[in-house]
Amino acid sequence: MNSTARRTATDDVNKLIQRRYSETPRERLDYINHFSMASTDGFNPDEISWVNDRIGVTDLVGAFVAAAEGNFVINVAGETDSPCDIKEPEDPRIGPEALRETLDRIADEMHNVIETTDKKVVVHCYMGMERSVLSVVWYLHRYEGKTIDAAYQIVANVRPIAIDHRSWIAT
């Protein structure tokens, strides 16, 4: 998809999301900007932030772009509908142990896709800053041997709106 087509598709999806949720991810970002791990000046949450050559993080709008580009899309936001290959809602209210089990399933699915296909994996939640970030952090920890600190730093380097929610999985 060329940049003009991507921009048009992104604008169209933002309009649909505005109608359904009464705000776009960009508008929500303005409200919660100060929680981010790095400066978010000029950052577009609708972009896919590539953690490495096969794993990306994005918001709901970016999920539509990721699907259109043929990527394997994982939706971790129970409240959103998107063109995804799997939907595995991540809810921190279920408690740390149950959430770690959910994260294990997501990481296992990511690993399976990476090992058995040539597709890129894109994980999204509504904003692309909490649940999707934690999913990718957990994958990096579980399958690439990164510490939680190192994994969060890797993600924050490419997605400055990332919010550290390791407390959700604390024992």
Q: What are these model-derived regions, one by one?
A:
Residues 2-40, 64:
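A short, flexible N-terminal coil/short beta segment enriched in small residues
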Residues 32-123, 138-171:
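Cysteine-based protein phosphatase catalytic domain of the PTP/DSP
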Residues 125-127:
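Short, well-ordered beta-to-alpha junction loops that form the rim of enzyme active sites
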Residues 129-134:
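Glycine-rich nucleophile elbow surrounding the catalytic serine of serine-hydrolase chemistry
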